[in-house]
Amino acid sequence: MSTVDIDSLVEQICSLDLCKAAELVDKMEQKLGFPKGGLLTAVPAAGGGQAESSAAEEKTDFSVIFDSYAADKKISVIKAVRECTNLGLKEAKEFVEKEGAKELIEGKKYKKEEAEEIKKKLEDAGAKVIIK
């Protein structure tokens, strides 16, 4: 690849919305064989005890919990779930129709900003979402 191609690729990646960027990261992790959750979960943190205590004080990884949805908004909720995950139409429909609260992507942790954006997108579609 030439430098021009790389620059173009960088521009395309930077123009992705948060859900599509998360989908890209998931696919790249799968393609490259990274452990689920990324490399940082496999490598112990370096540094003194002060860094560890400040990390314990402020939560940085959040789960997005899909709780329920408004019955009249079912189609838009399914579309939003598909947009925020790698699920196909059938899987997204089954996910939405499944009773009870469940993680949007099981075991997937999001940064606070990303979790808030996903929550807003799903709530705008008619879903009730919890961030833990």
UniProtKB/Swiss-Prot annotation:
InterPro entries on file: Ribosomal_bL12, Ribosomal_bL12_C, Ribosomal_bL12_C/ClpS-like, Ribosomal_bL12_oligo_N_sf
Ribonucleoprotein listed as a keyword: yes
Keyword vocabulary terms for this entry: Ribonucleoprotein, Ribosomal protein
BP GO terms, sorted: translation
GO terms assigned for molecular function: mRNA binding; structural constituent of ribosome
Parts of the chain that traverse the membrane: none
Gene Ontology cellular component list: ribonucleoprotein complex; ribosome
Family: Belongs to the bacterial ribosomal protein bL12 family.
Subunit structure: Homodimer. Part of the ribosomal stalk of the 50S ribosomal subunit. Forms a multimeric L10(L12)X complex, where L10 forms an elongated spine to which 2 to 4 L12 dimers bind in a sequential fashion. Binds GTP-bound translation factors.
PANTHER family: 39S RIBOSOMAL PROTEIN L12 (PTHR45987), LARGE RIBOSOMAL SUBUNIT PROTEIN BL12M (PTHR45987:SF4)
Task of the protein: Forms part of the ribosomal stalk which helps the ribosome interact with GTP-bound translation factors. Is thus essential for accurate translation.
HAMAP family (alphabetical): Ribosomal_bL12 (MF_00368)
Protein name per the record: Large ribosomal subunit protein bL12
Species, as recorded: Ehrlichia canis (strain Jake)
